[in-house]
Amino acid sequence: MATNTVVGNLVCSDGTNIPLKAEIAEGTESDLTTDTVYTVSAQNIGDYAPGKVLVAGSIQADNGISYAYVLSQGLVASIIPVSVKGVSQEVPMLCAPYQLKAGDKIRVLTLTNSARNASLCVYTAQGVSRIFVATPTGAGTEQLLDLQTGNAIGDTLQGQTIVKGFGSSIDGSKIETMGAYVVDALGNVVGAVPLSDPANNAPIFSMSYNIPVALNFKAQYLLNA
């Protein structure tokens, strides 16, 4: 896989900006560190600005991008909006303010412009951020599974309610559902999150969801190819 120059900017509650930049291989989740032009040395954000409170951010790649997040003590602590360069018109607010801790990192998955990786990024009323992913190879129903555990959404978020979310996929007209559906144990749709192509429309968190999640629920979408 080729490398690409990934850039970003994080905004803190006190007005501090944290510029990010790194050469990252497409198709491999990697650390995104601070931009050495402005921060002298490349550092992970938790070591560069411990105690600062993130309130907004955007991360952009050359050809394709699936997701970005703050990794803290092994968990997804905060999800950062993503896009291909030249698409985003703003630095979006995060779902909730997040105070950086020493050791925190930005993790990002960049892609080629033809990679079909899909992601569903959600935030719950209980304050939990999670990412669900899939890599389809053809037609059929594709389940999105937890990035860190490989579990279904019902196992990961049992008893919680999704209140914010966005989805990412380049598949466009190949998708025959209204984005990613959350379905209950009987297959009934209890919520839907659009899947946007980050090369054409920067995915941003919608604030209008009220999607309950229980055991045996799934996140999935249907493809015609």
Regions found by a protein language model. Give the residues of each.
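Beta-strand-centric surfaces of beta-sandwich/beta-rich domains
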Residues: 1-225
